[in-house]
């Protein structure tokens, strides 16, 4: 019988088992800050690997995009159907300073708006703000029945739809091109542009549920730290702990009781 190596016998591994390293031990938490146009500026926290060699932590944070509900930013549940996108532009200490980077509707809100017996009208336009941001605005609107109308349906004619769409584009261009990004976002929150469109198209066909449903930023200007700090302001008025004075009755020193037999 030939004597040779038995392949079935497994060789012992060199060295012992490697220690399991917690991946979070090499990471740091940073606070995500929203612009000052929103009521609540503390969006949340984000993780990033610590600075090691040529890999700098702040560089790994820049240009991250966070999606936040407007209800959380404004403290108003009526705005829960709006999603705001914020992009990290700079890191100051442990704060990640973000800029507005888009807006969208939740799917359930859009589905709830679409109904039968009415006409859906949509329009979109590319605009440039005074601070050189190029945006694409998407508008949505629905026809409604006139006062004292008996007929169930409220369908608009093709010529009326074209007129309404033209009005939508004109108003969106006028409102967006006359202000900077900060002021434009302030118009999105209370739906000021939608109300303006609804008022302007009243003579063509009455509309309801007029919204700027989506905003995309196509092109942003070169990064300017001064402008970013103007958008964010200072953080001296943040929600921090304050000293609480004890009431006078609690501060009264209790007299020690005499123990009999001591």
Swiss-Prot record:
Disulfides per UniProt: none
Biased composition (Basic residues): 1-18
InterPro entries: Ribosomal_eS1, Ribosomal_eS1_CS, Ribosomal_eS1_euk
Protein location: Cytoplasm
Membrane-spanning residues: none
GO molecular function, one term: structural constituent of ribosome
Alphabetic keyword roster: Cytoplasm, Ribonucleoprotein, Ribosomal protein
Pfam family, one: Ribosomal_S3Ae
Primary location recorded for the protein, binned into one broad class: cytoplasm
The keyword Ribosomal protein appears for this protein: yes
A cellular component term, taken from the record's GO annotations: cytosol
Any GO BP annotation: translation
SMART domains tied to this protein: Ribosomal_S3Ae
PANTHER family given in the database record: 40S RIBOSOMAL PROTEIN S3A (PTHR11830)
Subunit and interaction comment: Component of the small ribosomal subunit. Mature ribosomes consist of a small (40S) and a large (60S) subunit. The 40S subunit contains about 33 different proteins and 1 molecule of RNA (18S). The 60S subunit contains about 49 different proteins and 3 molecules of RNA (25S, 5.8S and 5S).
Family: Belongs to the eukaryotic ribosomal protein eS1 family.
Protein name in UniProt: Small ribosomal subunit protein eS1z
Gene: RPS3AA
